[in-house]
From Swiss-Prot:
Example of a GO biological process term: nervous system development
Name of the protein in question: Ataxin-10
Free-text function comment from the UniProt entry: May play a role in the regulation of cytokinesis. May play a role in signaling by stimulating protein glycosylation. Induces neuritogenesis by activating the Ras-MAP kinase pathway and is necessary for the survival of cerebellar neurons. Does not appear to play a major role in ciliogenesis.
Gene source species: Homo sapiens (Human)
Post-translational modification: Polyubiquitinated. Phosphorylation at Ser-12 by AURKB promotes the association of ATXN10 with PLK1. Phosphorylation at Ser-77 and Thr-82 by PLK1 may play a role in the regulation of cytokinesis and may stimulate the proteasome-mediated degradation of ATXN10.
Modified residues annotated as Omega-N-methylarginine in this record: R10
A Pfam family per the record: Atx10homo_assoc
Length: 475
């Protein structure tokens, strides 16, 4: 007695007989190709047969794209397509011979065309998503460590496949298409990306939506941040949330346990130019937070993050020297500190010392840190730089910084940065030391305030001497 036929596949309630012979053969091959020795001994004729099945099955998908009512009849074809992709995916694992054989059959072009048809269907059945994912995995595997395959994948996939997949609602499709992009990109192709900035922006969005996904993160940190031309072209086109995401990853790169290399420094000098010039031009958007009108938190947060990047950049000796002489940066920072300090005194707003801290991550907390980081940046820019020390004096920045030294619940870290800034402003600078000593004598800076920031004034005869009570910190 013959064995009973297996139940037919089901899609959208319609019963469709499964093509048993081809499907079982493909599943057997897929299992065999999990072993390296089987991959290495596979004859090329097998891949031609798999490709023939793939092409034949793709006709049903093409028909469904032309006639949406045919989507219900795709079950058997999708089973075969999925197993073809799984078989080819496994065959390519660490086997350049198979990668080359499969590529030379023009399988890559067939796969990309089929994946684009999947996206065109706009159907989210699990069977279709599975075929979609397996197709992308195959493209990732055939391109892995194989420059010839990477070139062919790029020719067929760029830009349409990435534009179709990087913003897909399925996170696995986003991850697999990001893997293909990371694997295929090189220096020359980065230039092509500059002409298709929507793809780069989609990668930023993908990381924003799926921060746990490794591939968008690697594309940004290992590729985008090594291309100042791409970052400069892309940055003006990013919305505020996307800017914050990119700047956060830039901070992560700068503050990583692995310091910037010699090759990184010229690139990050270009980034420093972009960040500093953007901050100088746009920093006053933060003042909107002090207005009575509902502020644009996202715009202000993007500006605040620019300051955070500048603070971290000025910890690096090579980047510090460039930013210390950046035109208008120090002046703008002092001017902005003065404006928000006055705004905080005149009315009760987000910059007021009496403001209370709300939930973690609230914009008010970020704004309070903004004043601290302005003072921190002033201190960094004045580190062992007499020209900047004198410039702060000329701009009446020293009394301004001291006046900010009022500990409050809203800004518990402000005092430590005032201490740091005053130390850097007075190091080997007798003029600035004399100014602070005279301020204390005239009652413009009380002794308790100076003691709080680590100084005391001592009178020797007719001369006032500012003495430090703490060790000099580094930036």
């Amino acid at each position: 007695m013959a064995a009973p036929r297996p139940p037919p596949a089901r899609l959208s309630g319609v019963m469709v007989p499964a093509p048993i012979q081809d499907l079982e053969a493909l599943r057997a091959l897929t299992a065999l190709f999990k072993e390296q020795r089987n991959r290495e001994t596979a004859p090329r004729t097998i891949f031609q047969r798999v490709l023939d099945i793939l092409k034949k099955s793709s006709h049903a998908v093409e028909l469904a794209c032309r006639d949406p009512s045919q989507v219900e009849n795709l079950a058997s074809s999708l089973q075969l397509i999925t197993e073809c992709f799984r078989c080819l995916r496994n065959a390519c694992i660490e086997c350049s011979v198979n990668q080359n054989s499969i590529r030379n059959l023009d399988t890559i072009g067939v796969a990309v065309d089929l994946i684009l048809l999947f996206r065109e269907l706009r159907v989210e059945q699990e069977s279709l998503l599975t075929a979609f994912r397996c197709g992308l995995q195959f493209l990732g595997n055939i391109a892995s460590r194989n420059e010839d395959s990477q070139s062919i994948v790029w020719v067929h996939a760029f830009p349409e496949l990435f534009l179709s997949c990087l913003n897909h609602p399925d996170k696995k499709i986003v991850a697999y298409s990001s893997m293909i992009l990371f694997t295929s990109l090189n220096h020359e192709r980065m230039k092509e990306l500059e002409e298709n900035l929507n793809i780069a922006i989609d990668v930023i969005d993908a990381y924003q939506k799926h921060p746990e996904s490794e591939w968008p993160f690697l594309i940004i940190t290992d590729l985008f941040l090594k291309s100042p031309e791409l970052v400069q072209a892309m940055f003006p086109k990013l919305n505020n949330q996307e800017r914050v995401t990119l700047l956060d990853l830039m901070i992560a790169k700068i503050t990583s346990d692995e310091p910037l290399t010699k090759d990184d420094i010229p690139v990050f000098l270009r980034h420093a130019e972009l960040i500093a010039s953007t901050f100088v031009d746009q920093c006053k958007t933060v003042l909107k937070l002090a207005s009575e009108e509902p502020p644009d938190d996202e715009e202000a947060l993007a500006t605040i993050r620019l300051l955070d990047v500048l603070c971290e950049m000025t910890v690096n000796t090579e980047l510090l020297g460039y930013l210390q002489v950046f035109p208008g940066l120090l002046e703008r920072v002092i001017d902005l500190l003065r404006v928000i300090h006055v705004a905080g005194k005149e009315t009760t707003n987000i910059f007021s010392n009496c403001g209370c801290v709300r939930a973690e991550g609230d914009i008010s907390n970020v704004a309070n840190g903004f004043k601290s980081h302005l003072i921190r940046l002033i201190g960094n820019l004045c580190y062992k730089n007499k020209d900047n020390q004198d410039k702060v004096n000329e701009l009446d920045g020293i009394p301004l910084i001291l006046d900010n030294c009022n500990i409050s619940d809203s800004n518990p870290f402000l005092t430590q940065w005032v201490i740091y800034a005053i130390r850097n402003l007075t190091e080997d600078n007798s003029q600035n030391q004399d100014l602070i000593a005279k301020m204390e004598e005239q009652g413009l800076a009380d002794a308790s305030l100076l003691k709080k920031v680590g100084f005391e004034v001592e009178k020797k005869g007719e001369k006032l001497i500012l003495k430090s009570t703490r060790d000099t910190p580094k930036p």
